[in-house]
């Protein structure tokens, strides 16, 4: 079904990470955190009410922290021909605000996440540790077709790095990963009110279109790449044909004191077939966290 595992001596790999994103989604000069009953819940909430252009609303930034737990199914034929399964846990942070241009039609969004998983082979005699760090910056155009709805679509530049460590492999214990991609992104939000309490349902998706990915070639060791300098198509172009990927997140946000309690579900599908190697990481996660808005001086 899958190609045989290559027992190759692997050197450790340290991969640099994006130090910052082009989109500065963090606001300056915060003056007040909102409550669920605030008259201007945020500029984004004004869009939810059906009025996208709201010049009287203070400029706001939305911050959301989410914590996750779920299951992961991982296959990396550089390490093993078997798919490993186990528990994944992680955290993510999202910040979003309207731009200074475009009459509050455009928003910028930054998102960062860190996930780790402990996995076992089908016979439970092999274990793997998996870690991924990712970040993205997006620019989205907002529009509303119906009262209470907000839609947005745009593009995102995203990058990620990580590794998988297999406890059974003596000569070939680890695989490092690094990739950047341009992705299409979109979201839909709906806000309803129960009494004077706003409740928001949000669903969003990211679909990478084209990018670059590091990968050793079939039968190639990290010693050959980094010590001997033997390059063998180790940076490859990715697109949906060889690396179909999708992240889909849905959350429900409920008023809770001066913030919002957010619960939801996330599916993240990462897979590729490059350099004669197959990889997939299928994740399903339960989410819980909180969302806040910070009012700022224009």
What are these regions (language model features)?
Residues 76-84, 119-127, 169-176, 234-238, ...:
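Extracellular loop and loop/strand-boundary signature of outer-membrane beta-barrel proteins
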């Amino acid at each position: 079904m899958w190609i045989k595992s290559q027992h190759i001596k692997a050197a450790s790999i340290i991969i640099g990470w994006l130090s910052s994103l082009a989109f500065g989604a963090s606001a300056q000069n915060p003056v007040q955190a909102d409550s669920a009953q605030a008259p201007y819940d945020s500029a984004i909430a004004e869009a939810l009410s059906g009025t996208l252009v709201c010049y009287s609303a203070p400029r706001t930034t939305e911050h959301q922290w989410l914590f996750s737990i779920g299951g992961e199914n991982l296959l990396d034929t550089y390490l093993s021909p078997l798919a490993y399964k186990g528990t994944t846990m992680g955290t993510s942070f999202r910040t979003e605000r309207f731009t200074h241009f475009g009459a509050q039609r455009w928003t910028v969004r930054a998102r960062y996440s860190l996930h780790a998983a402990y996995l076992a082979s089908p016979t439970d005699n092999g274990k793997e540790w998996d870690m991924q760090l990712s970040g993205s910056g997006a620019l989205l155009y907002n529009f509303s077709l119906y009262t209470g709805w907000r839609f947005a679509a745009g593009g995102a530049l995203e990058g990620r790095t990580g590794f998988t460590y297999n406890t059974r492999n003596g000569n070939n214990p680890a695989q490092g990963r690094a990739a950047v991609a341009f992705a299409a992104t979109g979201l839909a939000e709906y806000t309803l009110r129960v009494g004077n309490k706003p409740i928001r349902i949000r669903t969003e998706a990211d679909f990478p279109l084209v990018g670059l990915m590091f990968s050793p070639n079939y039968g190639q060791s990290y010693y050959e790449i980094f010590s001997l300098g033997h390059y063998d198509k180790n940076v490859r172009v990715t697109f949906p044909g060889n690396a179909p990927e999708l992240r889909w997140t849905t959350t429900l946000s409920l008023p809770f004191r001066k913030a919002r309690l957010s619960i939801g579900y996330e599916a993240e599908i990462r897979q590729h077939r490059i350099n004669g190697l197959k990889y997939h990481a299928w994740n399903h996660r339960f989410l819980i966290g909180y969302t806040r808005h910070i009012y700022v001086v224009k």
